From Swiss-Prot:
Catalytic activity entry: acetaldehyde + NAD(+) + CoA = acetyl-CoA + NADH + H(+)
GO MF terms, alphabetically ordered: acetaldehyde dehydrogenase (acetylating) activity; NAD binding
The organism's taxonomic lineage, starting at the top: Bacteria, Bacillati, Actinomycetota, Actinomycetes, Mycobacteriales
Protein name per UniProt: Acetaldehyde dehydrogenase
Residue ranges crossing the lipid bilayer per the database entry: none
Length: 306
C-alpha cells in the first residue's frame, strides 16, 4: 500500500466534521489538519481529540507552515474559497471545493469523475446535484433528454444558515449541473425545505423528457446501474420504486416522460441519518479525493517503472 496523501480540512462546521469521520476510514487519504476561525468550535475540539493538528487562525496559518498538505477539502463559504483557491494552486495543493464557488469543474462521481482526476481544483456542485444529477446522467446516456427537472426535498432541520442564504445559488448551480454534467439540453432545479418533525430523510424526484420511441427497459437498467454505483460510497442512496414512464399530457408539457424517485439516508457518522443531503456531499467529496489519490499513486508507479 502506497503512502496516503496528507489532507487538511478547511472549515470546522457540521459538514467538515462529518467529512473528517469519513476520511479517517480512508485507505488513501490521511486527515492531518483541521482549520477554522472559531476557537470554541466543536469541530476543532473533536478533531484535536482524534489526533489532528488544529488552528482557528484560518488558511493563513495552514499556508505559512513548512509542511503543507497534499490536498485540501474546503467547506467554508464561496467568498472564502475564491480568495484561498489561487493560494492553494500556487502552493501545489489539490483542492476539493464543497462551497458554491465553482472555480474548478463540477464533479458528480458516476457521471464525470474520470474526466477531472488531474484538475487542480474540483467543485462538488450541490447536495441536490449529487443526489439527482446521477439519475439524469443515467437517462441521457441511453436517450436524448431535451428537458430535465429535479425536485430535492430536504429536512428543514438539516438546512443551516448557509443553505438558506444560498437558495437562489443552489437552484442556479444545480440547474447548470443537470445540463452540463447530467446531459440534459435544458435543466431546472427546485429545493423544498420540509419542516416536518420528526425530520424526514432527503427525497428527490427527477423528471426527464424522453423520445417517443425510447427503450424503457434500457433506461430502467441504466438507472439501476447508476444507483448501484452511487451506493458504493452512499449506501443509503436508493430507488423508492421502479422508474415511471408516462405518455404526453397537459400536465407534463406534452412530453413522453420518465420519473425517478430516490431517497438518501445518511450514514450517521456525525450528522443524523435524516441529513442525507449533507451526507451525500461529504461522501462524494471523500470519493473524489480517494480517486484522485489513487490516480496519483498509479501515475507515480508507472513513472517509476518507466
Amino acid at each position: 500500500m502506497a503512502d496516503k496523501l496528507s489532507v487538511a480540512i478547511v472549515g470546522s462546521g457540521n459538514i467538515s466534521t462529518d467529512l473528517l469521520y469519513k476520511l479517517l476510514r480512508s485507505e488513501w487519504l490521511e486527515p492531518r489538519w483541521m482549520i477554522g476561525i472559531d476557537p470554541e468550535s466543536e469541530g476543532l475540539a473533536r478533531a484535536r481529540k482524534l489526533g489532528l493538528e488544529t488552528s482557528h487562525e484560518g488558511v493563513d496559518w495552514l499556508l505559512a507552515r513548512d509542511e503543507k498538505p497534499d490536498m485540501v477539502f474546503e467547506a467554508t463559504s464561496a467568498y472564502v474559497h475564491r480568495d484561498a483557491a489561487p493560494r492553494y494552486a500556487e502552493a501545489g495543493i489539490r483542492a476539493i471545493d464543497l462551497t458554491p464557488a465553482a472555480i474548478g469543474p463540477g464533479v458528480i462521481p458516476p457521471a464525470n469523475l474520470r474526466e477531472h482526476l488531474d484538475a487542480p481544483n474540483v467543485n462538488m456542485v450541490t447536495c441536490g446535484g449529487q443526489a439527482t444529477i446521477p439519475m439524469v446522467h443515467a437517462v441521457s446516456r441511453v436517450v436524448d433528454v431535451p428537458y430535465a427537472e429535479i425536485v430535492a426535498s430536504v429536512s428543514s432541520a438539516s438546512a443551516g444558515p448557509g443553505t438558506r442564504a444560498n437558495i437562489d445559488e443552489f437552484t442556479k448551480t444545480t440547474s447548470a449541473g443537470v445540463e452540463v454534467i447530467g446531459g440534459a439540453r435544458r435543466g431546472k432545479a427546485i429545493i423544498i425545505l420540509n419542516p416536518a418533525d420528526p425530520p424526514m430523510i432527503m427525497r428527490d424526484t427527477i423528471f426527464c423528457a424522453i423520445p417517443e420511441d425510447a427503450d424503457h427497459a434500457a433506461i430502467t437498467q441504466s438507472v439501476k446501474d447508476v444507483v448501484a454505483e452511487v451506493q458504493t460510497y452512499v449506501p443509503g442512496y436508493r430507488l423508492l420504486n421502479e422508474p415511471q414512464f408516462d405518455e404526453p399530457s397537459v400536465v407534463n408539457g406534452g412530453n413522453h416522460l420518465v420519473t425517478i424517485f430516490v431517497e438518501v439516508e445518511g450514514a450517521g457518522d456525525y450528522l443524523p441519518p435524516y441529513a442525507g443531503n449533507l451526507d451525500i456531499m461529504t461522501a462524494a467529496a471523500a470519493k473524489v479525493g480517494e480517486e484522485i489519490a489513487r490516480e496519483r499513486v498509479a501515475t507515480s508507479t508507472t513513472g517509476a517503472q518507466a
